[in-house]
Structure formats: structure tokens, C-alpha cells
């Protein structure tokens, strides 16, 4: 009974329960500690696995780089055509034609005639690249069928080449004779139609912005060129009814700086405005000296290209003006050359082109020169340059008209416009000896400064006066352009011209002053 009493003792029972709770708590703490340890180990394992994978990837990449470095370099060639059985390809590589195999991974549709291909170690085509973008330039003489062309280089050597894929594209126009092609002579392919850079370099095709209002003192010359150039374009039906052929060309000649180039530009601008919605006119401004080329026949070829371009632009009925500035530089009298005498071939080329313009009523040639006696007479005969217009040096009335173009109420003035212009003209045309000419018969003629007045000179005088007015305005002395500024500018212009006359060749003075008469034997600066 005593043992039974002790086993059911409450104190012992409580002690056992406390022990169990403590043990459970300890075990729970151990479990949580083990869980944390497991999580840490799992995270470390994941990180180690990632590092191992990264190391393997880097090792694999390094192995690949080593393999790539150990491979031989790739060769490139030009694809020519597929073999007849369609399993191999004909290529040009290393200066020889070869038949090679193609990689099974290569898409046959990427192989176009003329495309570059990359070759493997066994000369197997691995991939198709782009078309060649560098090479020689040649001029297309004529097309042979649709896929071949006859070309000529600068030396005149001709050969036949095939057209590469881009030139065979049916969505584009085929090259035309006269086009410049990019070619690979060894492969025998033409890859690209190069734009006519020489035309853009030598010519300005858009209509200028110069109008007749901008030209002063040349009313008679403007009327003459309007009658010669604009009437046939504006009233072609009247010319047809009277069976009158429009002139093929106009020659503007006279002393330098008197407005010959301005007149030609104003004609193109006036035509462009008058035809209105019907289109625009084209002004092909040929820079004469830049046509000269050391290669035989190159100057003639460029002249042909210019006229071909003019015919192309005139095909839709729009007026086209071909303007040759400094015409004497390239169309001198045949037989006058002292070196290669290139005029013997250049002049006939222009004559042939002028005669070829006969059926193109909307193309006209305008030439400008201050040495008209040097131009070959065959160019100046009727039927070629039909109209000859002399652009004289301005007289008092013309000079006043030119001054009025530059001195207007739109700029700050210290006096009325008319007063300033009258003062400038009076001072400019005041007799002041410049040079003394002794003619071949012994007579003596004294030329004054006003004998050398030109439109360009008047424009320069006004610019000088405006600069002086600006300086005085900044210094607070005067406001606006004054008569003193103009007088001082005229004196400066005359003073700076004193050291410029050339007295070594007296014959030149007959041309400089723009007069016809006896030869000059001696020149003396006064």
C-alpha cells in the first residue's frame, strides 16, 4: 500500500513532466539548429554548383578559343555560278577559277552571281557574305543581252564583264551606256552603278535664284537674250507656224566682271518661273577648266556625258540650259596649242554635240568669255552659237542703275538714296588718268579709272563703304551710309588697282579695255 502511494505522488509526476518539456524543448532547438545548418549547407552547395558551372563554361569557351586559334584562316572568293548538276559551285579565288563543294548548312538561295563567299579548310563554301564594295571604275559602253556589259577604262581598254546580283535586280533599271560601274576585272564582274559624281562635280543642275531685277545697267543685253532664249520656250507654236528654228546657242562676251554669268543665271530662273506648274528648268553650269584632264579622250568623254545628261533632263519637255563659263579655256582655236594641242579633238566633240541638239528645241547652250578671239571660229558660226551678245562696261546711266541695286532704303543711310547714288557716280566718273597707251601708229591715248568700271567693281565699292559705315557706327561717329563713305571707298578701289596693271604685254590692253582698234605698242602707268 505504501509503494502504491508513492507511485501516485503528485510531486514526482510534476517532476517527470518538467523533464519531458525540457527534453522536448532541447530537441526542438536541436532540430531548428540542424535546419539552419542544412539551409546554409544547401545555399553553399548551390553557390558551389553555380561556380562549378561557370568554371566549366569558361573552360569550354577557352577550349573553343584554342580550337579557333588552331584553325587555318578563311579564304574569300567570288561566286560565279552553280555547276550544271547543282551540287557544286563555280568560284573565283586566289586569281583562278575553281569548282568547290558547298556546306550542307548553306542556303543555296543566298548564292547570287558576284557575291563574296567564305571558304573552309578544304575550299568548301561555308557562308555567303556581301557584295564587293571596292574595286576599279569603268564606263559602260553598251549592254550585251541582260547579264553582260562592254566596259572601257580610263586608258581606253575594253572588255566584257558580267553583271552581279544587284545590277540584275528586275525592280531596278539596267545600267545605261555612259554609266560608271564598279568592277572586279579579275573576277569579270560589275557590282554597282556608281552615281555620276563627275557631273555633280562639274555641273549645277538646279535653277539659280538670280533674277533680272538683280542685274543693273544691262537692259539691252537682257532684252536680246530674252528674245533669243525665252521666246522659243514660251511660244513654241509660233515658231512652228513660222517655220523658224530656235537658236542652238548664245555667246556672251565682253570685259570681265560685267554680268555675263549673272545674265545666264537669270535666264534659267526666269524660265523656271514662267513655265510655273509645268515643271522647272535646269541650269547645267559647266566649270570649263575642270573639264581638262591629262588622259587622252577624257575631256571629250565628259563633254559627251554632259550633253547626254542634258538630253535626259529635256526628255520631258523642260527647258535645259548648258552654261560654259570661261569658254576660251577649253574651246580654243584649233592649231593654237603649244603642247598636246588638245583643241583638235575637244572642239570637234563640242561641234558634234551642238549639231546633235538640233532636234531638242528645249536645250540651249550659253557660253561666256572675255577672250572671244581665242574661241575656235567653227563654234561661233551661225547654226551653232547663233546669237552673239556683247556685255559692255557700264556707262554713267548703267553705273547708277547698278548702284541702285545695292544702296536702298533697307539699309541705314545718312542721306537720301538718290543723293548718295549721284555723288558716287559723279566721283566714280570724274576723269583721273590711269594708264597711257602708245598705239602702233604713234598716237597716244590716256585711259582714266572710269574706263575700267564694271558691275563687280561697283559691288565691291559699296561693300567697302558699308564696312566703313559699320566701323564709324561702332565708334559712335556717324549712323548710316554716307557720301563720304562712298567717296573714300572709290578712292580706295582706285588706289589698290594702281599696282595691278600688266605692262609686259601691251597687246593684252586692247582686250582688257574692251575696245577694238589699233594694236598697243607701249603701256605706261600714269
From Swiss-Prot:
One of the record's GO cellular component terms: proteasome complex
Membrane spanning residue stretches: none
GO biological process terms on file: modification-dependent protein catabolic process; proteasomal protein catabolic process
Keyword Phosphoprotein applies: no
Residue ranges that the Swiss-Prot or TrEMBL entry lists as coiled coil: 20-59
InterPro entries (alphabetical): AAA+_ATPase, AAA_ATPase_domain, ATPase_AAA_core, ATPase_AAA_CS, NA-bd_OB-fold, P-loop_NTPase, Prot_ATP_ID_OB_2nd, Prot_ATP_ID_OB_N
Highest taxon in the source lineage: Bacteria
Binding site for ATP: 257-262
One protein family per Pfam: Prot_ATP_ID_OB_C
GO molecular function term, any single one: ATP hydrolysis activity
Biased composition (Polar residues): 1-18
Keywords recorded for this protein, A-Z: ATP-binding, Coiled coil, Nucleotide-binding
Keyword field contains Repressor: no
Residue segments, region Disordered: 1-20
Family: Belongs to the AAA ATPase family.
Subunit structure, interactors included: Homohexamer. Assembles into a hexameric ring structure.
Name used for this protein in its record: AAA ATPase forming ring-shaped complexes
